[in-house]
């Protein structure tokens, strides 16, 4: 290995440890650390509460065109978005500051490890954001040192010089469902048990990050297939979405308790990403976040009931599940969705249709990259390396 590369990696780890030392100095004696942790977060720091600060000097972390991993439905600049200010907002927690994202340091901490994201297209956006952050902050050494492939439901990024993989597994409802394929069914049907099909891909992950919210929010009841019928059509009962969600999250926690060792692995749940798809496309033509004067009274569309269910079930897990709370911060960012500036995969309007009624074609659910998911990864980075003291083992 070349001497400059060794020095760069050493400095990256030193930077992480220096950040940990600064926090520890203010906190006194440190608790026993969780896997991957290098320090503990300051007491009373809720990184999910704060404000968006315009920071043209430090944001974005990377340019859209320089990241090879972004899907066409998230490349807003390439699809003609006329403004770019949505890329330049930095999340500032109310009572503390986030450490600077250190790409090389993160890869060093993941050396020889497997990090896996499991969930829906919103989590895939966060996964893609992380790959972009690592690509920009820790360029590969050439000679095929990085690779990326997608086979069916699994995407794998390999950082070969670190012997590390960062993966995404598509399971929008976590349990096996009729939403696992490319089609978007009108009704949601999930298998009540077991979780063998999906969870067989999850085993062995050293860092597991999962989410599930969007695909539950149809307004209709969820169909539950009981037993092991292969054609997904027999012995079906219906449940309210929140209770079906509870059922599946209980399955997930049981799987975690039987398959994850909290002394060597970490688990995180990313909270609901809000949609701003109100009547007439609430996000269309928005160019700034919800202002500070309106933020206190602004109430997003996120289902508080679903959030409550997730908190109750995951909070009772015997395997600690770190919560990455992105809901409130994202509710304030109605400006940062892909709107009409994306590849139109499903309903493909003509140019005339789009010009006549752009609001009806606006995607007010997914996020442009670079953008809001980068801030989610800053929170994940914080949680992974600087967990709260009450999360210590």
From Swiss-Prot:
<feature type="disulfide bond">
    <location>
        <begin position="283"/>
        <end position="364"/>
    </location>
</feature>
<feature type="glycosylation site" description="N-linked (GlcNAc...) asparagine">
    <location>
        <position position="102"/>
    </location>
</feature>
<dbReference type="GO" id="GO:0005794">
    <property type="term" value="C:Golgi apparatus"/>
</dbReference>
<feature type="topological domain" description="Cytoplasmic">
    <location>
        <begin position="1"/>
        <end position="9"/>
    </location>
</feature>
<keyword id="KW-0325">Glycoprotein</keyword>
<feature type="glycosylation site" description="N-linked (GlcNAc...) asparagine">
    <location>
        <position position="325"/>
    </location>
</feature>
<feature type="short sequence motif" description="GDS motif">
    <location>
        <begin position="119"/>
        <end position="121"/>
    </location>
</feature>
<comment type="similarity">
    <text>Belongs to the PC-esterase family. TBL subfamily.</text>
</comment>
<dbReference type="InterPro" id="IPR026057">
    <property type="entry name" value="TBL_C"/>
</dbReference>
<comment type="function">
    <text>Probable xylan acetyltransferase required for 2-O- and 3-O-monoacetylation of xylosyl residues in xylan. Possesses extremely low activity in vitro.</text>
</comment>
<dbReference type="Pfam" id="PF13839">
    <property type="entry name" value="PC-Esterase"/>
</dbReference>
<keyword id="KW-1133">Transmembrane helix</keyword>
<dbReference type="GO" id="GO:1990937">
    <property type="term" value="P:xylan acetylation"/>
</dbReference>
<dbReference type="GO" id="GO:0016413">
    <property type="term" value="F:O-acetyltransferase activity"/>
</dbReference>
<keyword id="KW-0472">Membrane</keyword>
<protein>
    <recommendedName>
        <fullName>Probable xylan O-acetyltransferase 11</fullName>
        <ecNumber>2.3.1.-</ecNumber>
    </recommendedName>
</protein>
<keyword id="KW-0735">Signal-anchor</keyword>
<dbReference type="Pfam" id="PF14416">
    <property type="entry name" value="PMR5N"/>
</dbReference>
<dbReference type="GO" id="GO:0000139">
    <property type="term" value="C:Golgi membrane"/>
</dbReference>
<feature type="active site" description="Proton donor">
    <location>
        <position position="363"/>
    </location>
</feature>
<feature type="active site" description="Proton acceptor">
    <location>
        <position position="366"/>
    </location>
</feature>
<keyword id="KW-1015">Disulfide bond</keyword>
<keyword id="KW-0333">Golgi apparatus</keyword>
<dbReference type="GO" id="GO:1990538">
    <property type="term" value="F:xylan O-acetyltransferase activity"/>
</dbReference>
<dbReference type="InterPro" id="IPR025846">
    <property type="entry name" value="TBL_N"/>
</dbReference>
<feature type="disulfide bond">
    <location>
        <begin position="76"/>
        <end position="368"/>
    </location>
</feature>
<feature type="active site" description="Nucleophile">
    <location>
        <position position="121"/>
    </location>
</feature>
<dbReference type="InterPro" id="IPR029962">
    <property type="entry name" value="TBL"/>
</dbReference>
<feature type="disulfide bond">
    <location>
        <begin position="67"/>
        <end position="132"/>
    </location>
</feature>
<keyword id="KW-0808">Transferase</keyword>
<keyword id="KW-0812">Transmembrane</keyword>
<feature type="transmembrane region" description="Helical; Signal-anchor for type II membrane protein">
    <location>
        <begin position="10"/>
        <end position="26"/>
    </location>
</feature>
<feature type="topological domain" description="Lumenal">
    <location>
        <begin position="27"/>
        <end position="393"/>
    </location>
</feature>
<feature type="short sequence motif" description="DXXH motif">
    <location>
        <begin position="363"/>
        <end position="366"/>
    </location>
</feature>
<feature type="disulfide bond">
    <location>
        <begin position="45"/>
        <end position="96"/>
    </location>
</feature>
